């Protein structure tokens, strides 16, 4: 297996919280019903959990874009909804893809790590091929 892309993203939770539920923002169509449900089930702020998921989506896009260095982008700009962050019964995150990005990354394993510290959420994504 080989690493073909690495992406990282940081999100200011207070700034994200101001925008996440505003009509007309990019976030209104970004999260799947499952992601919104998981965030609302948590004991702390839903915005805190969604911010980490936004960071993960951005990290995956950056990892994929970096793997295509000097090549024309092939994904549309509203790809975020096709990147879903799910968790297993122990709360470990995993990325589930659909649509065009799933076709482009069909043979790629995506490793993702999310974190929150004070007012910041962050995520790292690593793309690996067999």
From Swiss-Prot:
UniProt xrefs under InterPro entries: 4-PPantetheinyl_Trfase_dom (IPR008278), 4-PPantetheinyl_Trfase_dom_sf (IPR037143), ACPS (IPR002582), Ppantetheine-prot_Trfase_dom (IPR004568)
Magnesium listed as a keyword: yes
Binding residues annotated for Mg(2+), in chain numbering: 9, 58
Gene Ontology terms describing biological process: fatty acid biosynthetic process
Cofactor: Mg(2+)
EC number: 2.7.8.7
Catalytic reaction list: apo-[ACP] + CoA = holo-[ACP] + adenosine 3',5'-bisphosphate + H(+)
Subcellular location: Cytoplasm
GO molecular function: holo-[acyl-carrier-protein] synthase activity; magnesium ion binding
Keyword field: Cytoplasm, Fatty acid biosynthesis, Fatty acid metabolism, Lipid biosynthesis, Lipid metabolism, Magnesium, Metal-binding, Transferase
Predominant location: cytoplasm
Pfam families listed in its UniProt record: ACPS
Gene Ontology cellular component annotations, sorted alphabetically: cytoplasm
Family according to the record: Belongs to the P-Pant transferase superfamily. AcpS family.
Functional summary from the UniProt entry: Transfers the 4'-phosphopantetheine moiety from coenzyme A to a Ser of acyl-carrier-protein.
Protein name per the record: Holo-[acyl-carrier-protein] synthase
Species: Mycolicibacterium paratuberculosis (strain ATCC BAA-968 / K-10) (Mycobacterium paratuberculosis)
Gene: acpS
């Amino acid at each position: 297996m080989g690493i073909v892309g690495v992406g990282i993203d940081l999100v200011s939770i207070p700034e994200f919280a101001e925008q996440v539920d505003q009509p007309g923002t990019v976030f209104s169509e970004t999260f799947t019903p499952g992601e919104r449900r998981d965030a609302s089930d948590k004991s702390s702020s839903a915005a805190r959990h969604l911010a980490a998921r936004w960071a993960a989506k951005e990290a995956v896009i950056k990892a994929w874009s970096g793997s295509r260095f000097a090549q024309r982008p092939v994904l549309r700009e509203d790809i975020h909804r096709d990147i879903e962050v799910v968790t297993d019964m122990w709360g470990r995150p995993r990325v589930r893809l659909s649509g065009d990005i799933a076709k482009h990354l069909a043979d790629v394993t995506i490793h993702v790590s999310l974190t929150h510290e004070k007012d910041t959420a962050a995520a790292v994504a690593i793309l690996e091929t067999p």
